[in-house]
Amino acid sequence: MNIKIVCVGKLKEKYFKDAIAEYKKRLSRFAKVSIVQVPDEKAPEKFSAAEDERVKQIEGERILSKIKDKEYVYVTAIKGKQRSSEEFAKEIQNLATYGHSDITFVIGGSLGTSNAVNKRGDDLISFGKLTMPHQLMRVVLIEQIYRAFMINSGSPYHK
């Protein structure tokens, strides 16, 4: 299985990089994991709704350029469907069972994702109503992917 995480912006904090590297290493026995970063678009601190949409559109085009047609795509979104870890694990298992060996997760920038990215997504996934930095979301996401594989393998990691 191939897991790809497409993110907007560079990860600067060493502690986030270290956590992601650790989960990538742990996941390597189950799947090939790649993290693709696309540049974030600079925006003024105070901007209009039109400027907000322009930034999301530009970042969205960058995201979409990294996604292939055959990939099953989850887009992280506050308004996405919330799942338990067990439900998420079952979805990953079902995708693998039914021939989806390439799964992509998208984490948008600080403004979210464009309508085009959301439409390309096969599913919108939410990790709760809380707002968190998109850099932290990378760690949360990769840990939950690892947890899903551990649940599916019957490991006591998930208690």
Swiss-Prot record:
Indicate yes or no for the key word Nuclease.
no
Xref: CDD domains = RlmH-like (cd18081)
Query: Which Pfam families does the UniProt record give?
Result: SPOUT_MTase
* GO molecular function terms noted in the UniProt entry: rRNA (pseudouridine-N3-)-methyltransferase activity
Q: Which reaction does it catalyse?
A: pseudouridine(1915) in 23S rRNA + S-adenosyl-L-methionine = N(3)-methylpseudouridine(1915) in 23S rRNA + S-adenosyl-L-homocysteine + H(+)
Keyword terms of this UniProt record: Cytoplasm, Methyltransferase, rRNA processing, S-adenosyl-L-methionine, Transferase
Question: What HAMAP family has UniProt attached to this entry?
Answer: 23SrRNA_methyltr_H
Q: How does it assemble?
A: Homodimer.
Q: What is this protein called?
A: Ribosomal RNA large subunit methyltransferase H
Task: Name the species this protein comes from.
Answer: Lactobacillus helveticus (strain DPC 4571)
Origin organism lineage = Bacteria, Bacillati, Bacillota, Bacilli, Lactobacillales
